Amino acid sequence: MKNIGKFRFWLIILILCQVSPDLSAQESSRIKVMSWNIRLDTENDGPSQWKYRKDALCNEVILQSPDVLGVQEALHNQMKDMRKQLKGYRSLGVARDDGKKAGEYSAIFYNRKRMKAIRSGTFWLSETPDIPGSRGWDAACNRVVTWAEFREKSSGKHFVMFNTHFDHMGDTARVESAILIISKAGSIAGKLPVILTGDLNVTDKHRAYRILTYPENEVVLSDTRVRAGAEIKGPDFTFVGFDPEFVPTQLIDYIFATWDFNVISNHILDFRQNIPYFSDHLPVISVLEFK
């Protein structure tokens, strides 16, 4: 009996030695991506103001533990709050009105234990993308893109992430913004895998969406929710407002990725059981795997 017990013990040790490296390799090849319009801080939101929901929102980010997170509509004070609460993360990006602190950020947060930022930058969605605060086409607001090249520390694999927020009024601006992003992705990322997160203010029927996912582009992006197949979770909408009586219908927040990745899952996280809501948008989460 003692020999049988010893045999079982060493058999378990042998199995663990064989399985652990594979599990570690699988974990290092996967990236958890999150995109969230956190709603700007404004007194007009009354009981749904940032000061009443910031702790719950940051706690949700910590709970979900994304490797990279693209946020939209963050004002400078909101960036400071998130940096303070998200201890394991660093952030990249500048405000859209002056390239410093004025206006909204479309910032990127990243898990500093898993990811190393190699290079990063900003461009504006306009005819003069390198001029801070420039406004493009028929847009109602200045719009910005934050990008960064990351190296996943365990695997050594690189990718480039772009995060943005398209204009809510200018239809030409949304179309031209999509064209510009594809062009910039090609020049910035080259042959590296690409991830694009953002609130695009369009549905999948809009021309801007079709431009981003056009299969003949220099950088071919795919909607990770479309590719997730059976691993889709959550509702088919992302804009929910703050009124529990509001009936949401629009899916306008996305995570796109090049075909360098397998899409393991896509989840639109429905938090509407919480009052006040964390934001007026639901976050999108995708798990991607390097091929």
Over which residues does each language-model region extend?
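Structured beta-strand-rich core segments of catalytic domains in phosphoester-bond hydrolases
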Residues: 68-158
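Bacterial N-terminal signal peptides
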Residues: 10-18
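Active-site beta-strand/loop signature of hydrolases that rely on acidic residues for catalysis
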Residues: 31-38, 57-82, 109, 148, ...
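Metal-dependent phosphoester-hydrolase catalytic domains
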Residues: 114, 172, 176, 183-194, ...
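Short, solvent-exposed loop/turn elements at domain surfaces
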Residues: 40-47, 71, 118, 171, ...
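Solvent-exposed loop/turn segments at secondary-structure junctions
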Residues: 38-41, 75-78, 96-100, 114-115, ...
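Metal-dependent phosphoester/phosphodiester hydrolase catalytic core
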Residues: 140-144, 151-175, 187-188
